[in-house]
Each structure stands twice: as structure tokens, then as C-alpha cells.
């Protein structure tokens, strides 16, 4: 009797796990990111992405994390007949929030001028297309802008090139329109 009860509990638990699909992988675009998705039913998912948005160009160092809640919609029946022989095509749209930092060493010719530090927060959006293969692999292409205020500080290291050794400013993060930009994601579904 205990064995039957154990098997029944295990079967119910496995159905509950299967009903909440997850995917883990990476996104590659303007930067590189770790990506995790957790499904809520068949039409919603929570996406968590964290990584470096700039690929370390010109002595850069950066980090960013974004969480979005996405609504998933299948493509129409006509599209599915032609392009979905074994897999499944979906499009999705979502909103969320994100934050990050960006630091780079400013240089003119061979002289280091100082450090420029940015911290940004904002509202994130996401729109994309995904293909779920008949085996546990997912490919997607999406655009995920992150817009909001950014706070930055210039630190003069040579004491000559800038009138004030520290300059603090606040403005709108226009880089967020392309830094989260169009990305290709590859994820393992489990």
C-alpha cells in the first residue's frame, strides 16, 4: 500500500512540475546575458535576465539585471500549418523593471582622463518571437528596451583635464533603447 501511495504522490508531483515549464540559457546581442524563464500556465511567463550589456568595449565594465512578465500568444493556424511541422511558434509581449551599472575609463590619446560611472534603473519592455522545438530546445529573438533615469559621476584621475574632480549628473537613459536591444536567445527547456 505504501508503494502505491508513493507512486501516486510521485505521479501527481511530476504533473505539477510539468505544468510549470522552465527554460535556462543565454541571450546574445549587444551584450551577453544569462536567461531564465518560468512559465505560469500556457500563456504567461516570468523572464529573468542578468549579464553584461556592452561586451567590455573600450575599458568598459557593466552589469544589468531585468525581470519581465510576458504574455505568450501562438501564431495563427495558417502560419502554424506551414512553419510548425513539429515545433511551436509563439510571439510574446511583456513589461517589467531593470537596473544596472556601467563604468568606463576615459582615455584621450595615451592619457587617462578619469572614470565615468553610471547607475540606471527603469521600466523594461519586451517583444519577441520564439520557436519551441519538439525536443527541449527553444530559440527566440526579442527586443527588450530599458528606459528610465540614470545617475552618473565623472571622477578625474589626472587633476588637469576636467575643471572639477567630481561631477554628478542625472539624466534620461537613452542607451537603454539599444543596450538591451535585439538579441538571440538559446534556452534548454525542462
Name what the model sees in each region.
Residues 4-5, 189:
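Residue-level detector of intrinsically disordered/flexible regions characterized by low predicted structural confidence
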Residues 67-190:
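Outer-membrane beta-barrel transmembrane domain signature
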Amino acid at each position: 500500500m505504501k508503494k502505491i501511495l508513493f507512486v501516486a504522490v510521485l505521479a501527481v508531483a511530476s504533473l505539477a512540475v510539468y505544468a510549470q515549464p522552465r527554460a535556462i540559457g543565454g541571450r546574445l546581442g549587444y551584450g551577453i546575458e544569462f536567461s531564465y524563464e518560468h512559465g505560469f500556465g500556457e500563456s504567461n511567463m516570468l523572464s529573468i535576465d542578468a549579464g553584461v550589456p556592452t561586451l567590455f568595449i573600450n575599458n568598459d565594465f557593466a552589469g544589468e539585471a531585468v525581470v519581465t512578465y510576458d504574455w505568450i500568444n501562438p501564431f495563427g493556424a495558417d502560419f502554424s500549418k506551414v512553419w510548425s511541422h513539429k515545433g511551436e511558434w509563439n510571439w510574446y509581449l511583456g513589461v517589467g523593471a531593470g537596473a544596472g551599472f556601467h563604468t568606463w575609463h576615459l582615455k584621450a590619446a595615451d592619457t587617462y582622463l578619469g572614470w565615468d560611472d553610471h547607475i540606471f534603473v527603469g521600466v523594461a519592455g519586451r517583444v519577441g518571437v520564439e520557436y519551441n522545438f519538439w525536443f527541449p530546445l527553444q530559440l527566440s529573438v526579442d527586443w527588450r528596451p530599458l528606459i528610465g533615469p540614470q545617475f552618473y559621476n565623472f571622477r578625474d584621475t589626472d587633476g588637469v583635464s576636467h575643471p572639477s574632480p567630481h561631477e554628478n549628473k542625472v539624466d534620461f537613459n537613452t542607451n537603454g533603447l539599444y543596450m538591451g536591444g535585439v538579441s538571440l536567445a538559446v534556452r534548454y527547456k525542462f
